[in-house]
Amino acid sequence: MSGLTYEDVSGGVGLRVTVPVTMGPDGAARELAPRLSALAGERAPASPHGEPARATRAVPVVTIDGYSGSGKSTLAAALARLVNGWQVLHLDDWYPGWDGLEAGADIARRIAADLRAGRASSYEAWDWENGTTGATIPVPLAPTIIEGCGAIEAEADLVIWIADPGEDERRSRALARDGQTYAPHWQRWADQDLGRPVK
């Protein structure tokens, strides 16, 4: 029996799925993978010979969101192992610094809009060590998972929200993942993260 809950996203844009705290990333990925495969299949245009043609139009976009340390990256990695042909984009790669959650969400919205309109996209990578923008990274036209705090802001075919396991658990996971470099910024980031509207 599924532990996932489903609801229509306002405006009929897509479907929102909530992953409960009690469901691990591998179990959630196993349940979600067939839905992603179906989305990719629906968007693959057929050639005149009845074979799938190379995508030249809109591609599906799936977003994974949840508060910092909730398991977004882990779920994205688990899904990527189960579905072929999907690229995974991480908002961590383009947030412009520790105060950049809103700007990162804007970039996610733009990338999703480009891909859903059948256009390749790009973003400027953020150099966390030097606190500056880095290289421009191309985002090819391919089925895409966008994960990170603020990803829910982008219009998507499927929006995945990971339920909050509680601040202590999230902080523990985030610091285990990012080390002590994140520790002095935890509250600063949490204020943005918890203060944002979650649709």
Predicted region positions:
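Small-molecule kinase domains that catalyze NTP-dependent phosphoryl transfer to phosphate-bearing small molecules
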Residues: 4, 179-199
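Charged, amphipathic alpha-helical linker segments immediately N-terminal to NTP-binding catalytic cores
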Residues: 1-27
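P-loop (Walker A) phosphate-binding loop of NTP-binding proteins
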Residues: 67
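ATP-dependent NMP and nucleoside kinases share a basic, alpha-helical "lid"
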Residues: 135-177
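Conserved nucleotide-sensing/catalytic segment adjacent to the nucleotide-binding pocket
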Residues: 87-146
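Conserved lysine of the Walker
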Residues: 72
